[in-house]
Amino acid sequence: MSVEEKKRRLEELKDQNVVLGLAIQRSRLSVKRLKLEYGVLLERLESRIELDPELNCEDPLPTLASFKQELLTKPFRKSKTKRHKVKERDPNMPKRPTNAYLLYCEMNKERIRQNGSLDVTRDLAEGWKNLNEQDRKPYYKLYSEDRERYQMEMEIYNKKISNIDADDDKEENEQKIKNNEEGSSTKVADSKGGEDGSLVSSN
């Protein structure tokens, strides 16, 4: 191989490396985007569970088909009430337990994606729907353990909150007593000043 051919081959390899580098970069960005989208989806599902008590149980979430059916059967009504500001969640509050369906999604999403799925959410819902009770048991067990963890952490959290509230009430009461004492002292001083003034005027 001549020097010119080696140079040409080297340039080709450099170009290929640049193309591969760009492809890898695009793939990484795609993975980040998919992770972000999946995270947002999970947050929406968890928010729905928190808002609807019927979903906060061991039963799976409704499928996309049921959502579509619900949208078709129920007319949309615009709420006339003012939207209330959502109370900010205490960052120290324990994380709510993840139900069995979301655990299944979390543990199987990568496998579904690697199989070339075009709609991971739909395929996860279908996969869960096709599981029998025996196959769902491990996810229910994990949910049960996570729920016990949540209950224990909430007990500790509520005790801390109670102690903080008690300390705040104590400080507030002490401040009120202090203010009352200062007010009483001021009144006594004013009354004495009035008496002294009356004595001077009488003399």
Curated annotation (Swiss-Prot):
Its main location: nucleus. GO terms for molecular function: DNA end binding; heteroduplex DNA loop binding. One of its GO terms (biological process) is DNA repair. The keyword Acetylation applies. Pfam families: HMG_box (PF00505). It is found in: Nucleus. The modification N-acetylserine is found at residue 2. SMART domains: HMG. GO terms for cellular component: Ino80 complex; nucleus. It comes from the Eukaryota. Residues 94-158 bind DNA. Keywords: Acetylation, DNA-binding, Nucleus, Transcription, Transcription regulation. Residues 78-97, 161-203 are annotated as: Disordered. Component of the chromatin-remodeling INO80 complex, at least composed of ARP4, ARP5, ARP8, RVB1, RVB2, TAF14, NHP10, IES1, IES3, IES4, IES6, ACT1, IES2, IES5 and INO80. Present with 1750 molecules/cell in log phase SD medium. Probably involved in transcription regulation via its interaction with the INO80 complex, a chromatin remodeling complex. This is Non-histone protein 10. It comes from Saccharomyces cerevisiae (strain ATCC 204508 / S288c). The gene is NHP10.
